[in-house]
């Protein structure tokens, strides 16, 4: 049985992963739970890990995975969904060629959306512009939401502190605008594609890595075109 703070943190991590595909930072978790220090977050995460609700990926910064949600919680904390069943994660089959939802009794659980994989994207030094379609993935619609989508295979380690690792597959919603702080696919000078966090500095655009080994790159607005925004991530073990 979870305490209120443990339950609140687990739900916050779960909702952030659903929305963005990457876990929240310790500062974001501290603010969300109105705690004064990160040590309290460390204790809560350790308790959730010991109880089998989350998993920390070793030697990787900011890498948390929700394994399950509780079937029972402390009195007064349960929502109808959490009280009735546990978490049903997406199951990624071996080749990443197909993705299917875990078993669920909900109507329409077997439906999928076909998403094209448009080659590789650099999470490091920019590489050549996005390639043509290489193959497709079948994605549960609840992972996507509205709009048009495509997927890219990540190469490089510049976004590791955002929980995005070399070899991951990122799900991108097509768009040509984004808010500062969003993780985007940026096309630089119509030649180089890169996955970075968007920062707007006056009339300039900054592409910020999530790895201190990489410098933030700043461009004039006419040199960068936004191709899409990160909405999810898939990883093969």
Swiss-Prot record:
Catalysed reactions listed for this entry: Hydrolysis of Ala-|-Gly bond in repressor LexA
EC category: hydrolase
Keyword list, A-Z: Autocatalytic cleavage, DNA damage, DNA repair, DNA replication, DNA-binding, Hydrolase, Repressor, SOS response, Transcription, Transcription regulation
DNA-binding region: 26-46
Site (Cleavage): 123-124
Active-site residues from the entry: 158, 196
One Pfam family this sequence matches: Peptidase_S24
MF (Gene Ontology): DNA binding; serine-type endopeptidase activity
InterPro entries, per the entry: LexA (IPR006200), LexA-like (IPR039418), LexA/Signal_pep-like_sf (IPR036286), LexA_DNA-bd_dom (IPR006199), LexA_repressor (IPR050077), Peptidase_S24_LexA (IPR006197), Peptidase_S24_S26A/B/C (IPR015927), WH-like_DNA-bd_sf (IPR036388)
One GO BP annotation of this record: negative regulation of DNA-templated transcription
EC annotation from Swiss-Prot or TrEMBL: 3.4.21.88
Domain of life: Bacteria
Cited HAMAP family: LexA
Assembly and interaction partners: Homodimer.
NCBIfam families reported in the protein's UniProt record: lexA (TIGR00498)
Entry similarity comment: Belongs to the peptidase S24 family.
Function of the molecule: Represses a number of genes involved in the response to DNA damage (SOS response), including recA and lexA. In the presence of single-stranded DNA, RecA interacts with LexA causing an autocatalytic cleavage which disrupts the DNA-binding part of LexA, leading to derepression of the SOS regulon and eventually DNA repair.
Full protein name: LexA repressor
Native species: Xanthobacter autotrophicus (strain ATCC BAA-1158 / Py2)
Gene that this polypeptide is encoded by: lexA
